[in-house]
Amino acid sequence: GKLKKWTIPFDYSVRKYGGDKSRKLSLMHPYIQVECAKFYESHDYYMLSLCSNSPFSIRYISERTKCIFKVEESETKEEEENLNRIEILDEEVDKLYRSYFSYKRYDMMYKFFTSGDYLRLEQKYSHLMKMDIARCFYHIYTHTIAWAVKGKEQAKELIGKETFENAFDTLMQHANYNETNGIIVGPEISRIFAEVILQRIDINVVNRLKQSPYSLTLGRDYEVRRYID
């Protein structure tokens, strides 16, 4: 029979090396994977635009990856080796095709803590605060994507309309039992979904801190680095 629009993901647990706690990850149903591919094809440039607004983010999609694969060594001249691979922005990322998008600025969190940027911030500021959004993906309300893209008032006016944000919302629901509370952890598209929402929060934070009673200026009084792992 015809496959339901909403699907059930395959869940499994992983444990970090040396850690005690496990974490639930999920694989999307193949039907939803195909729907995600169609969504990328239709909206990739808009997704890139929405992920380019935050001054805080240190891991975000920056451009479409070119589908160029490394050929067999026996067929490659040494001087051409660097041309026969997918386009990557960080030389340390492996040469295999990993993602539809290329990323800036750090693909792994530890690289930020060993970077010149981190050293500069240490020298500039006397205090460091670290924050974590616990179980972030599991608690994301999918309708929030509309608020992030269009604003809460306009989003209400566009409920049920065929818009990018409503399509993205529906896609994430269909990947996870048709639930609006939480998105699955693991797929790249989930991180992009969260990044769009958090970029809007980043901008709201900057604007709020400019106002009284804070009157704080980004780059002078404080700086923020945010990362989705």
Where are these regions (language model features)?
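Short, well-ordered loop/turn elements at secondary-structure boundaries
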Residues: E122-S126, E188, L218-D221, Y227-D229
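Short acidic-aromatic active-site loops that bind/stabilize oxyanions
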Residues: I183, P187-R191, E195
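Active-site palm subdomain of RNA-directed nucleic acid polymerases
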Residues: F193-I228
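Conserved two-metal-ion catalytic palm core of "right-hand" nucleic acid polymerases
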Residues: G1-V185
